[in-house]
Design a protein with these regions (language model features):
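Face-selective signature of the C-terminal outer-membrane beta-barrel domain
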Residues: 1-109, 130, 177-183, 232
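Short loop/turn motifs that connect adjacent beta-strands in outer-membrane beta-barrel proteins
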Residues: 27-34, 90, 134, 176, ...
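Transmembrane beta-strands of outer-membrane beta-barrel pores
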Residues: 30, 41-47, 97-105, 141-147, ...
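Transmembrane beta-strands of outer-membrane beta-barrel proteins
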Residues: 33-39, 93-95, 123, 137-139, ...
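Gram-negative outer-membrane beta-barrel transporters
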Residues: 89, 185, 207-298, 376-378
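Membrane-embedded beta-barrel scaffold of Gram-negative outer-membrane proteins
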Residues: 130, 136-140, 160-246
Length: 379
């Protein structure tokens, strides 16, 4: 305005959303057969607009001038059926079927429009076997599809992802311990993964990566050592790989081969040790370890997010004041007890100069030792 082409300004983006939904189901449960039939219908209508709320050189423009005014609408209709058959007191099987129909209608900044329709068929089937009162085993297969989001379309031309998930597990429940062990293999086609970059409003950018997989073993449990001590560990070992990662690099399309999927550490460990001082006082110690991970699917060294180990110490005290408070609780938590300096997240970006690709990273440092004090009152 008034000949001004460049100005410092502050902009603010808004969403004005309406969501409507309905669902129905029919349940049949008799003898050894249980059947559930149902469906849902959801409609989302969103207005997306941005305003200029301050400008150094405003010219003739008004405050809260809308520099874009778009919409984003999504309709979804799905039908599902859940069938379970109990063969005997030790074995039962289930089959779940779902059909999702999705319609996107949206306008993006720059005048680009989305007019997409998807029809996904998602089956799941499995077996449960109860060996005895303490041990149970299961196996399942599921196929799932996921459509891109509006943000994905704003940052590229994505495809929906497809997943085939295989799981095998063991559940144990005894007097002194409760634990679950789960093996999984997740085979993806066109998985939408984080690239490490952010768009101009801070959303993480995702992109399809062709063929990829996530495979691993998960363990979580509770161990009752005695009347005072309880240990609650959980651990995941995994391998998360892009089979052939292709991207533009140094002016041409490069195949980086098999790489780790971004933000997917191979080892995650957590543990809680609880000690009951008495019937009113609980002392606990939390430990969390996250292994090394990459913030870029290229796995270049500059995108490494280092592993970290952090510990917390807490105390819960239950009390009552007759006539005032019942079953109230005082909570004290010391986060990052050992004052560890670490980063739990960050980002990675690329830029090209004369057909040469350069990269950089940024990190989010976490708080050093800090304290929380809380009171819960029940009247």
């Amino acid at each position: 305005n008034s000949g001004q082409a460049i100005s410092d300004l502050i902009r603010r983006k808004w969403l004005d959303n309406d969501f409507y939904g309905s669902l129905f189901n029919f349940i049949y449960d008799k003898n050894s057969i249980k059947l559930i039939l149902g469906g849902t219908l959801n409609k989302y209508y969103g207005d997306h607009y941005g305003e200029v709320i301050w400008a150094r050189n405003a010219g003739n423009s008004e405050i809260r001038h809308r520099y874009y005014d778009n919409y984003g609408n999504k309709e979804e209709f799905n039908l599902f059926a859940k069938f379970q058959h109990t063969f005997n007191d030790k074995l039962y099987a289930f089959v779940d079927l779902q059909n999702r129909n999705i319609n996107y209608d949206a306008e993006l900044i720059g005048g680009n429009n989305i007019n997409k329709s998807f029809n996904f068929f998602n089956p799941k089937a499995g077996l449960y076997y109860k060996l005895n009162s303490n041990n149970e085993f299961y196996f399942s297969f599921a196929r799932a599809h996921r459509e891109p989001t509006r943000t994905d379309y704003e940052n590229g031309n994505p495809f929906p992802e497809k997943l085939d998930d295989f799981e095998l597990g063991w559940k144990h429940k005894g007097k002194k311990s409760i634990y679950n062990i789960n093996l999984y293999f997740m085979d993806y086609n066109d998985q939408l993964v984080l690239t490490g970059e952010r768009d101009d409003v801070g959303y993480y950018v995702r992109a399809n990566v062709g063929e990829s997989y996530r495979a691993g073993i998960e363990f979580d449990g509770i161990f009752f050592i005695n009347d005072y001590f309880t240990i609650k560990p959980n651990i995941t070992f995994s391998s998360n790989k892009n089979n052939d990662y292709l991207t533009q690099f140094d002016g041409s399309l490069r195949n980086f081969g098999k790489t780790d999927i971004s933000f997917s550490p191979n080892l995650i460990f957590g543990n809680t040790v609880e000690y009951n001082l008495n019937s009113k006082t609980l002392l606990f110690f939390n430990t969390k370890y996250v292994g090394k991970q990459y913030m870029s699917n290229t796995n270049v060294d500059s995108s490494i997010l280092a592993s970290y180990l952090v510990n917390d110490l807490g105390l819960n005290y239950n009390f009552s004041i007759p006539g005032f408070f019942q079953d109230s609780e005082l909570k004290l938590l010391v986060n990052n007890l050992l004052n560890q300096k670490y980063e739990s997240y960050g980002g990675h970006y690329f830029y090209d100069i004369d057909n040469k690709t350069y990269s950089g990273s940024y990190f989010y440092p976490m708080a050093e030792i800090n304290f929380l004090l809380g009171l819960d009152f029940n009247f």
